[in-house]
UniProtKB/Swiss-Prot annotation:
Organism whose genome encodes this protein: Solanum lycopersicum
Protein function: Catalyzes the conversion of hemimercaptal, formed from methylglyoxal and glutathione, to S-lactoylglutathione.
Record-linked Gene3D superfamilies: 2,3-Dihydroxybiphenyl 1,2-Dioxygenase, domain 1 (3.10.180.10)
Taxonomic lineage: Eukaryota, Viridiplantae, Streptophyta, Embryophyta, Tracheophyta
Expression induction: By stress conditions such as salt stress, water deficit, or treatment with abscisic acid.
Catalytic activity field: (R)-S-lactoylglutathione = methylglyoxal + glutathione
Gene name tied to this protein: GLX1
EC number: 4.4.1.5
Ranges where the VOC domain occurs: 27-174
Functional pathway: Secondary metabolite metabolism; methylglyoxal degradation; (R)-lactate from methylglyoxal: step 1/2
Active site residues of this protein: E170 (proton donor/acceptor)
A GO molecular function held by the record: lactoylglutathione lyase activity
Disordered, as annotated region: 1-21
Protein name as annotated: Lactoylglutathione lyase
Top-rank taxon, per record: Eukaryota
Binding-site residues, Zn(2+): Q30, E96, H124, E170
């Protein structure tokens, strides 16, 4: 008799085998990063990673703006601002960039904690690309800062880059991730 998969509930205490029916339809919609300068961050996420701006929301009384980035085709987005907001919040896996006004020009603002130094917390987001090596060559030509290049370290074929605020982004392709996963126990 074959042993159960490591992914099975019996091998993962606390994991429910069947999600509660009340959660049917739930999905992960966004991850939020606080950013210092929207001009710099929007250029990075659109030019370097190829994301589109799905929706911008400004909150003048509270002095902040939200920029929702993603890989959706914005040609299908409604033109009505309220409908476009609803459309944006119906997309899967968006990145919400939160800009608190004034940080871009504040000489005393030192940036946000990215979670990868003490005290550790949040680690990174991940982006799938067609070919990790070609993508990283392009990133290098664009002057992107690397944490790890695909040939560095023990896990070959996986890279980590930094966005302008120091947040880590894992870069991988599905072929190489299959090979890397094959070495896991």
């Amino acid at each position: 008799m074959a042993s159960e998969s490591k992914d099975s509930p019996s091998n993962n205490p606390g994991l429910h085998a069947t999600p509660d029916e009340a959660t049917k339809g739930y999905f992960l919609q966004q991850t939020m990063f606080r950013i210092k300068d929207p001009k710099v961050s929007l250029e990075f996420y659109s030019k370097v990673l190829g994301m589109s701006l799905l929706k911008r929301l400004d909150f003048p009384e509270m002095k902040f703006s939200l920029y929702f980035m993603g890989y959706e085709d914005t040609a299908s987005a409604p033109s009505d601002p309220v409908e476009r907001t609803a459309w944006t919040f119906s997309q899967k896996s968006t990145l919400e960039l939160t800009h608190n006004w004034g940080t871009e020009s504040d000489p005393n603002f030192t940036g946000y904690h990215n979670g990868n130094s003490e005290p550790r917390g949040f680690g990174h987001i991940g982006v799938t690309v067609d070919d990790v090596y070609k993508a990283c060559e392009r990133f290098e030509s664009l002057g992107v800062e690397f944490v790890k290049k695909p040939l560095d370290g023990k896990m070959k074929g996986i890279a980590f880059i930094k966005d302008p605020d120091g947040y880590w982004i894992e870069i991988f392709d599905t072929k190489i991730i299959k090979d890397a996963a094959g070495s896991a126990s």
